[in-house]
């Protein structure tokens, strides 16, 4: 990572087998693509199905409903990231100690994924100052961190701040992406006569700001701007209990995390119409009169989201004490809660941003039920040495159920079971010249399940407005447009 001098987590993926080196593009969301050939336009299943786990807690995007309804212009659509997984631009790299990318079959401990798993562990301990300055044609980055470690008390504290300012074109100061992160990580270990207690707690802030504005001098003094801000506040705590002696009980782990976001999109544009256009304002099905729009007006369209995520996990590891066979039995359960408390699409329906193509109405996101998942899992890890060989077996099963679903959904009350198995055989070691070598054959098979997001479970209703009468008169007071409005429920209750 020091060799790459990364600006975001996207750059680290160059180190993966088959990874390509390319210039960073921070003007649009960076989503991960693993186990995928090519990048089909609009196909985000791979990135949505990849789980990012930072210090033991997953990053959830299930409540992300940030999109501008009815948008068709590239300035807006190219920056949307709904149902597309984690935007890697928001992940700072300077605090990272270790990254593990699992493109095969992960442990049953990890659920709500299909494509892969990215495990990130951040640096802890030390007493050094760390700083990094980076400047190139497209971006400027500043990072400062301080580690504090009290050895007698077995306590650590790490503080860090990171700021990034990137431009798609260094000549254009009106389009830029900025990121600001702050992290405080605390760790403490207690020792008793029989057990070792360890606690790790994190407090993080991530701010991501995406701006694009057309120069008024080049746009006939017309306003045309896009502003997006993402503010995330997160807390994560991990408690571990392990015995000092080798007994049947290995460890007990508890992970708790909570995150709250304030996301806001502001799109402002001068709308100029070439013909008489109507704005539909009805929210119920039936016959209604539309509002005839002026030929020129300034439209303001905001999207407010307030995703809330809560996560809890309990793991227990057990073993049969043996000097020959290494074994670990993992038993655990986890619970995940997602809710969006934002106001959603906020705009004047009589002055729409995309006149003539609006098939939606303002909707308060807080009225959407929460998305809750409960998982249980069990896994056995076994290593058996024989005749200089070593046989490794990891086999387990995971069950996941969606809670808080209405009774008319196909997924209501059902458990989705994911059996997974990995098997490896390591042959005796040998030397090639003076170099020690070995051969290992491994394979596996398993099932993964990704649960639907809030938007997929509860999509916006579709409004179909058909013109029945269009009467034009030279006197504007006599003009009238009558519409027949159909409200189409886009909910797919047969998701499974």
Please tell me what each predicted stretch does:
Residues 190-208, 226-409:
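Face-selective signature of the C-terminal outer-membrane beta-barrel domain
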Residues 367-496:
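Structural signature of Gram-negative outer-membrane beta-barrels, strongest in the C-terminal barrel
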Residues 10-70:
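Extracytoplasmic beta-strand/coil segments of soluble accessory domains associated
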Residues 48, 116, 140-144, 178-184, ...:
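Hydrophobic, lipid-facing positions within transmembrane beta-strands of outer-membrane proteins
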Residues 57-102:
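Short acidic/polar hinge/loop motifs at secondary-structure boundaries
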Residues 135-139, 150, 161-167, 203-211, ...:
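Transmembrane beta-strands of outer-membrane beta-barrel pores
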Residues 12, 31-33, 53, 85-89, ...:
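N-terminal periplasmic accessory domains that precede
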Residues 130-165, 172-255, 259:
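Transmembrane beta-barrel wall of Gram-negative outer-membrane proteins
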